[in-house]
């Protein structure tokens, strides 16, 4: 039904514009929002015509600045606007006359303010769009990021396309999520920051992502919905076809108040959302940090549903804390059998090593070859479903750091030969030097095709959420 309505083709065209007008772009302030969109399009090397528009005219990066949309030669597909709210309807009419399919309004100051005058202005904007046949994204949002079409609202985003589609009511949360996920090896097919949703809304974009062959995972950050019945129907359909990860904002009294002033949404009862997600097998992290952890897990361990874990890392106390964290989340740590223990003793001295799972290799770092053999043996152990390694730069003395880095490289090589799922924890550090080491090691993990987490608790929770999701998915078949 969706394909026959033509809406898929319309939205697909919006994600792949052939020409863009940047209405309200400034030549003097490089930090102005429309300038950010302009700079991002240039950084991403958008291939179609780009038209900067500002009543003052002039030149920007060698491009003529047009004084109005009407001055643009030929037609445009898409417009990005940061003009004042009061002239937004006029801009829509000008864009319609130029053949635009959609206009994105970054502009705030509409219905989210609660002011009656600007609420009426938003209604006028919707009416004008309806009259002219143009679709509106926003207002009060960042718009669209589609690396395939070289369209972005942040020049720090990855230029590489991926398989995650993300719908976010918040522009800031969308930027945070994309940036953090990119560093974790997660790339996106499409990202939509839709703000007030005066026209196109969460249901429209969700329906598109369900159909989109480039999207394998769907993520959402929502503060409220416009049509609960339609959204629920789409959510149920989406959850049967693709993994869905949903963070709901505005859960408490204060959050609900912030929601109403942020995007003009009604937050809704959080217990209703919890029940809905359980019924439809939707993964519901508590916050954006957890969402990124879950997306990294789904990206690199999509079918993960293990319970028995092998934990490996340097430090007895850290190993104890990590074991506690995983057991609290329902994972099991099978004890190393006597037979395997005897084989391990052939590679490694028992003193200082916890050869009972978790494995503390801190006393074996001076003999990385033997340690490599020991880890390879353990990863073949039939009682283990998956392996988790960890590294804590802040607990190491300066003299041990280089040795630990070499040992960690050896561990990752041993894990790389395993056919079992492997995850890695690289904890953040306070000092710049140690944080740089942590970042370097985390990027090695990502390059090897494994999920990386920044804390024991984050890893255990994300793995739990994905394991439970996959088990429920099987029961729904």
Each language-model region and where it sits:
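Catalytic-core regions of core metabolic enzymes
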Residues: 1-477
